[in-house]
Amino acid sequence: MIVQPSAVAKGWPIATTLLPASCGPADPKPEPKPKQRRLCRKVFPLRARCGALAHCPIPGKNEIFTNVNHSHISIPSPRLLLVEDDPRLREDLDAHFRRRGFRVTVCGDGSHGLEAAGREAFDLVLLDIMLPGLDGLALLESLRREQATPVMLMSALGAEQDRISGFTRGADDYLPKPFSLAELDARTDALLRRVRLDRLPLAQRRDTRLVFDDQAQDVLHQGLPAGLTPSEYRLLATLREHAGEALSKPFLYRSVLHRSYTRLDRGLDVHVCNLRRKLAVVAVRHLQIQAVRGQGYLLVETEHP
Protein backbone atom coordinates (compact mmCIF):
# COMPACT_ATOMS: atom_id res chain seq x y z
CA MET A 1 0.00 0.00 0.00
CA ILE A 2 1.30 3.49 -0.82
CA VAL A 3 0.91 6.17 1.85
CA GLN A 4 -1.14 9.00 0.34
CA PRO A 5 0.05 12.55 1.15
CA SER A 6 -3.54 13.47 2.05
CA ALA A 7 -3.54 10.90 4.86
CA VAL A 8 -0.39 12.38 6.36
CA ALA A 9 -1.82 15.88 6.07
CA LYS A 10 -4.84 14.86 8.10
CA GLY A 11 -2.56 13.90 10.97
CA TRP A 12 -3.36 10.19 10.89
CA PRO A 13 -0.65 8.12 12.61
CA ILE A 14 1.25 5.56 10.61
CA ALA A 15 1.67 2.19 12.34
CA THR A 16 3.80 -0.72 11.26
CA THR A 17 2.01 -4.06 11.31
CA LEU A 18 2.79 -7.55 10.13
CA LEU A 19 0.63 -8.40 7.13
CA PRO A 20 0.78 -11.05 4.41
CA ALA A 21 2.95 -10.29 1.43
CA SER A 22 -0.23 -10.15 -0.66
CA CYS A 23 -1.10 -6.76 0.80
CA GLY A 24 1.28 -5.22 -1.73
CA PRO A 25 4.86 -3.95 -1.54
CA ALA A 26 5.59 -0.55 0.00
CA ASP A 27 8.05 0.18 -2.82
CA PRO A 28 8.94 -1.42 -6.16
CA LYS A 29 11.14 -4.26 -4.90
CA PRO A 30 11.22 -7.91 -5.99
CA GLU A 31 8.23 -9.94 -4.76
CA PRO A 32 8.96 -11.89 -1.55
CA LYS A 33 9.05 -15.67 -1.61
CA PRO A 34 5.71 -17.51 -1.21
CA LYS A 35 4.38 -17.70 2.39
CA GLN A 36 7.00 -15.18 3.51
CA ARG A 37 5.73 -12.42 5.77
CA ARG A 38 7.21 -8.99 5.93
CA LEU A 39 6.60 -5.51 7.27
CA CYS A 40 4.40 -3.19 5.33
CA ARG A 41 3.02 0.22 6.20
CA LYS A 42 -0.63 0.87 6.82
CA VAL A 43 -2.50 4.10 7.50
CA PHE A 44 -5.48 4.17 9.85
CA PRO A 45 -7.30 6.91 11.76
CA LEU A 46 -6.40 7.39 15.42
CA ARG A 47 -9.78 6.08 16.56
CA ALA A 48 -9.88 3.17 14.13
CA ARG A 49 -11.16 0.05 15.83
CA CYS A 50 -8.67 -2.15 13.97
CA GLY A 51 -4.89 -2.00 14.06
CA ALA A 52 -4.80 -1.65 17.86
CA LEU A 53 -1.85 -4.06 18.01
CA ALA A 54 1.36 -2.57 16.71
CA HIS A 55 2.29 -6.13 15.72
CA CYS A 56 -0.25 -8.75 14.68
CA PRO A 57 0.46 -12.40 15.52
CA ILE A 58 1.58 -14.79 12.79
CA PRO A 59 0.50 -18.43 13.10
CA GLY A 60 3.52 -20.54 13.98
CA LYS A 61 5.72 -17.48 14.57
CA ASN A 62 4.34 -16.20 17.85
CA GLU A 63 7.62 -16.75 19.67
CA ILE A 64 8.63 -13.21 18.68
CA PHE A 65 5.86 -11.90 20.95
CA THR A 66 6.53 -14.19 23.92
CA ASN A 67 10.21 -13.54 24.52
CA VAL A 68 9.46 -11.79 27.84
CA ASN A 69 10.29 -13.86 30.93
CA HIS A 70 7.02 -14.53 32.76
CA SER A 71 8.34 -17.13 35.18
CA HIS A 72 8.22 -14.70 38.11
CA ILE A 73 4.39 -14.62 38.12
CA SER A 74 3.28 -16.81 41.00
CA ILE A 75 -0.44 -16.92 40.19
CA PRO A 76 -1.22 -20.20 38.37
CA SER A 77 -3.65 -19.84 35.44
CA PRO A 78 -4.62 -16.20 36.08
CA ARG A 79 -8.27 -15.40 35.40
CA LEU A 80 -8.67 -12.59 32.88
CA LEU A 81 -11.79 -10.68 31.85
CA LEU A 82 -11.38 -9.11 28.40
CA VAL A 83 -13.98 -6.51 27.39
CA GLU A 84 -13.37 -5.33 23.82
CA ASP A 85 -15.89 -4.63 21.05
CA ASP A 86 -13.50 -4.98 18.09
CA PRO A 87 -13.93 -8.66 17.04
CA ARG A 88 -10.50 -9.01 15.44
CA LEU A 89 -8.61 -7.48 18.36
CA ARG A 90 -10.71 -9.43 20.84
CA GLU A 91 -9.93 -12.69 19.04
CA ASP A 92 -6.18 -11.91 18.84
CA LEU A 93 -5.91 -11.02 22.53
CA ASP A 94 -7.98 -14.02 23.58
CA ALA A 95 -5.69 -16.37 21.66
CA HIS A 96 -2.55 -14.65 22.93
CA PHE A 97 -3.46 -14.88 26.61
CA ARG A 98 -4.68 -18.46 26.30
CA ARG A 99 -1.28 -19.38 24.87
CA ARG A 100 0.23 -17.85 27.99
CA GLY A 101 -1.93 -20.08 30.17
CA PHE A 102 -4.60 -17.55 31.18
CA ARG A 103 -8.23 -18.51 31.69
CA VAL A 104 -9.97 -15.88 29.57
CA THR A 105 -13.56 -14.67 29.57
CA VAL A 106 -14.38 -12.37 26.62
CA CYS A 107 -17.21 -9.86 26.30
CA GLY A 108 -18.07 -7.54 23.42
CA ASP A 109 -19.87 -4.78 25.33
CA GLY A 110 -19.95 -3.15 28.75
CA SER A 111 -23.23 -4.66 29.97
CA HIS A 112 -22.06 -8.24 29.43
CA GLY A 113 -18.70 -7.34 30.95
CA LEU A 114 -20.38 -6.09 34.12
CA GLU A 115 -22.47 -9.27 34.34
CA ALA A 116 -19.38 -11.45 33.95
CA ALA A 117 -17.52 -9.53 36.66
CA GLY A 118 -20.44 -10.10 39.00
CA ARG A 119 -20.56 -13.85 38.35
CA GLU A 120 -16.87 -14.69 38.67
CA ALA A 121 -13.81 -13.41 40.51
CA PHE A 122 -11.02 -12.32 38.16
CA ASP A 123 -7.36 -11.54 38.74
CA LEU A 124 -7.26 -8.87 36.03
CA VAL A 125 -9.65 -6.94 33.77
CA LEU A 126 -8.61 -5.58 30.35
CA LEU A 127 -11.18 -2.96 29.45
CA ASP A 128 -11.72 -0.92 26.30
CA ILE A 129 -13.20 2.55 26.85
CA MET A 130 -15.24 3.09 23.70
CA LEU A 131 -17.79 0.30 24.13
CA PRO A 132 -21.35 0.18 22.82
CA GLY A 133 -24.03 0.82 25.42
CA LEU A 134 -22.30 0.95 28.82
CA ASP A 135 -18.89 2.51 28.09
CA GLY A 136 -15.65 1.44 29.73
CA LEU A 137 -15.43 4.30 32.24
CA ALA A 138 -18.99 3.69 33.49
CA LEU A 139 -18.22 -0.02 33.79
CA LEU A 140 -15.04 0.80 35.71
CA GLU A 141 -16.96 2.95 38.20
CA SER A 142 -19.44 0.13 38.77
CA LEU A 143 -16.61 -2.35 39.37
CA ARG A 144 -14.91 -0.06 41.87
CA ARG A 145 -18.05 0.15 43.99
CA GLU A 146 -17.96 -3.63 44.45
CA GLN A 147 -14.37 -4.87 44.12
CA ALA A 148 -10.70 -3.95 43.88
CA THR A 149 -9.73 -6.19 40.94
CA PRO A 150 -6.90 -4.57 38.93
CA VAL A 151 -8.22 -2.93 35.75
CA MET A 152 -6.17 -1.89 32.73
CA LEU A 153 -7.87 0.49 30.32
CA MET A 154 -7.12 0.19 26.59
CA SER A 155 -8.06 3.06 24.33
CA ALA A 156 -7.10 5.04 21.23
CA LEU A 157 -7.80 8.12 23.37
CA GLY A 158 -4.25 8.57 24.60
CA ALA A 159 -4.20 12.27 25.48
CA GLU A 160 -3.07 13.28 28.97
CA GLN A 161 -6.56 14.33 30.07
CA ASP A 162 -7.99 11.00 28.90
CA ARG A 163 -5.41 9.10 30.95
CA ILE A 164 -6.04 11.27 34.00
CA SER A 165 -9.77 10.67 33.66
CA GLY A 166 -9.17 6.92 33.57
CA PHE A 167 -6.98 6.93 36.67
CA THR A 168 -9.37 9.13 38.65
CA ARG A 169 -12.20 6.68 37.86
CA GLY A 170 -10.17 3.86 39.41
CA ALA A 171 -7.97 2.40 36.65
CA ASP A 172 -4.75 0.71 37.72
CA ASP A 173 -3.09 1.16 34.33
CA TYR A 174 -3.82 2.85 30.99
CA LEU A 175 -2.50 1.43 27.71
CA PRO A 176 -2.95 3.66 24.63
CA LYS A 177 -3.63 2.04 21.26
CA PRO A 178 -1.79 0.98 19.18
CA PHE A 179 0.37 -1.13 21.49
CA SER A 180 2.71 -4.10 21.22
CA LEU A 181 2.08 -7.47 22.82
CA ALA A 182 5.45 -7.22 24.58
CA GLU A 183 4.37 -4.03 26.37
CA LEU A 184 0.95 -5.50 27.13
CA ASP A 185 2.59 -8.56 28.70
CA ALA A 186 4.93 -6.44 30.81
CA ARG A 187 2.06 -4.32 32.12
CA THR A 188 -0.22 -7.28 32.88
CA ASP A 189 2.62 -9.05 34.70
CA ALA A 190 3.16 -5.95 36.86
CA LEU A 191 -0.53 -5.81 37.78
CA LEU A 192 -0.64 -9.52 38.60
CA ARG A 193 2.27 -9.12 41.01
CA ARG A 194 0.05 -6.80 43.04
CA VAL A 195 -2.54 -9.51 43.62
CA ARG A 196 0.00 -12.26 44.33
CA LEU A 197 -0.16 -11.75 48.09
CA ASP A 198 -3.96 -12.08 48.14
CA ARG A 199 -3.70 -15.53 46.56
CA LEU A 200 -1.32 -16.89 49.21
CA PRO A 201 -2.66 -18.61 52.33
CA LEU A 202 -2.01 -16.87 55.63
CA ALA A 203 0.56 -19.47 56.64
CA GLN A 204 2.70 -18.50 53.63
CA ARG A 205 2.59 -14.80 54.53
CA ARG A 206 4.42 -15.27 57.78
CA ASP A 207 7.54 -13.23 58.38
CA THR A 208 9.86 -14.75 60.97
CA ARG A 209 9.39 -11.59 63.01
CA LEU A 210 6.02 -10.25 61.86
CA VAL A 211 2.69 -12.01 61.21
CA PHE A 212 -0.07 -10.59 59.00
CA ASP A 213 -3.56 -11.49 60.26
CA ASP A 214 -6.06 -10.87 57.46
CA GLN A 215 -9.09 -11.66 59.57
CA ALA A 216 -8.18 -9.22 62.35
CA GLN A 217 -6.70 -6.70 59.88
CA ASP A 218 -3.67 -6.40 62.14
CA VAL A 219 -0.05 -7.50 62.47
CA LEU A 220 1.56 -9.28 65.42
CA HIS A 221 5.15 -9.02 66.52
CA GLN A 222 6.34 -11.58 69.06
CA GLY A 223 2.68 -12.25 69.84
CA LEU A 224 1.82 -8.58 70.43
CA PRO A 225 -0.84 -6.97 68.18
CA ALA A 226 0.02 -3.56 66.76
CA GLY A 227 -3.61 -2.35 66.85
CA LEU A 228 -3.73 -1.19 63.23
CA THR A 229 -6.79 0.26 61.57
CA PRO A 230 -7.99 -1.40 58.32
CA SER A 231 -6.43 1.43 56.27
CA GLU A 232 -3.12 1.13 58.12
CA TYR A 233 -3.15 -2.63 57.61
CA ARG A 234 -3.80 -2.27 53.86
CA LEU A 235 -1.02 0.32 53.65
CA LEU A 236 1.53 -1.90 55.39
CA ALA A 237 0.50 -4.98 53.38
CA THR A 238 0.81 -3.04 50.11
CA LEU A 239 4.23 -1.64 51.03
CA ARG A 240 5.36 -5.08 52.24
CA GLU A 241 4.29 -6.69 48.94
CA HIS A 242 6.38 -4.11 47.05
CA ALA A 243 9.27 -3.97 49.55
CA GLY A 244 12.19 -2.05 48.09
CA GLU A 245 10.01 -0.34 45.47
CA ALA A 246 8.92 3.29 45.74
CA LEU A 247 5.13 3.49 45.42
CA SER A 248 3.58 6.73 44.21
CA LYS A 249 0.99 8.58 46.24
CA PRO A 250 -1.71 8.34 43.51
CA PHE A 251 -1.28 4.55 43.49
CA LEU A 252 -1.40 4.30 47.29
CA TYR A 253 -4.45 6.55 47.53
CA ARG A 254 -6.32 4.39 45.05
CA SER A 255 -5.13 1.02 46.40
CA VAL A 256 -5.23 1.76 50.13
CA LEU A 257 -7.62 4.67 50.74
CA HIS A 258 -9.87 3.95 47.73
CA ARG A 259 -10.03 7.55 46.61
CA SER A 260 -8.24 9.86 44.20
CA TYR A 261 -5.10 11.74 45.19
CA THR A 262 -5.00 15.53 45.47
CA ARG A 263 -1.99 17.55 46.55
CA LEU A 264 -3.87 19.13 49.48
CA ASP A 265 -4.93 15.74 50.87
CA ARG A 266 -2.60 14.71 53.73
CA GLY A 267 -4.57 11.62 54.70
CA LEU A 268 -1.91 9.20 53.50
CA ASP A 269 0.83 11.06 55.40
CA VAL A 270 -1.22 10.79 58.61
CA HIS A 271 -1.64 7.02 58.12
CA VAL A 272 2.10 6.62 57.54
CA CYS A 273 2.89 8.57 60.71
CA ASN A 274 0.47 6.47 62.79
CA LEU A 275 1.77 3.24 61.25
CA ARG A 276 5.37 4.10 62.12
CA ARG A 277 4.37 4.90 65.70
CA LYS A 278 2.37 1.66 66.19
CA LEU A 279 5.13 -0.51 64.76
CA ALA A 280 7.63 1.13 67.10
CA VAL A 281 5.38 0.39 70.09
CA VAL A 282 5.57 -3.37 69.41
CA ALA A 283 9.33 -3.08 68.77
CA VAL A 284 9.31 -3.71 64.99
CA ARG A 285 12.77 -2.46 64.03
CA HIS A 286 13.46 -4.42 60.86
CA LEU A 287 10.92 -2.50 58.75
CA GLN A 288 11.35 1.18 57.90
CA ILE A 289 8.86 3.29 55.94
CA GLN A 290 10.83 5.92 54.07
CA ALA A 291 9.53 8.94 52.16
CA VAL A 292 11.00 9.29 48.66
CA ARG A 293 10.96 12.90 47.52
CA GLY A 294 8.85 13.41 44.41
CA GLN A 295 7.78 9.76 44.29
CA GLY A 296 5.99 8.44 47.38
CA TYR A 297 6.82 5.87 50.06
CA LEU A 298 9.21 2.94 50.25
CA LEU A 299 9.40 0.01 52.69
CA VAL A 300 12.94 -1.05 53.55
CA GLU A 301 13.80 -4.27 55.39
CA THR A 302 16.91 -4.20 57.58
CA GLU A 303 18.86 -6.92 59.36
CA HIS A 304 17.75 -5.87 62.86
CA PRO A 305 16.08 -8.68 64.86
Curated annotation (Swiss-Prot):
- Which SUPFAM superfamilies is this protein grouped with? C-terminal effector domain of the bipartite response regulators (SSF46894), CheY-like (SSF52172)
- Return the annotated DNA-binding positions: 200-301
Give its localization: Cytoplasm
Q: Which GO terms describe its molecular function?
A: phosphorelay response regulator activity; transcription cis-regulatory region binding
Name the GO terms of the biological process aspect.
Answer: phosphorelay signal transduction system; regulation of DNA-templated transcription
Q: Which InterPro entries match?
A: CheY-like_superfamily, OmpR/PhoB-type_DNA-bd, Sig_transdc_resp-reg_C-effctor, Sig_transdc_resp-reg_receiver, WalR-like, WH-like_DNA-bd_sf
Q: Which UniProt keywords apply?
A: Cytoplasm, DNA-binding, Phosphoprotein, Transcription, Transcription regulation, Two-component regulatory system
PROSITE patterns per the record? Answer: OMPR_PHOB (PS51755), RESPONSE_REGULATORY (PS50110)
Task: Summarize the PTM comment.
Answer: Phosphorylated by PfeS.
A GO cellular component annotation here is: cytosol
Free-text function comment from the UniProt entry: Member of the two-component regulatory system PfeR/PfeS. Activates expression of the ferric enterobactin receptor.
- Protein name per Swiss-Prot or TrEMBL: Transcriptional activator protein PfeR
Please report the organism this UniProt entry assigns to the protein: Pseudomonas aeruginosa (strain ATCC 15692 / DSM 22644 / CIP 104116 / JCM 14847 / LMG 12228 / 1C / PRS 101 / PAO1)
Q: What is the lineage of its organism?
A: Bacteria, Pseudomonadati, Pseudomonadota, Gammaproteobacteria, Pseudomonadales
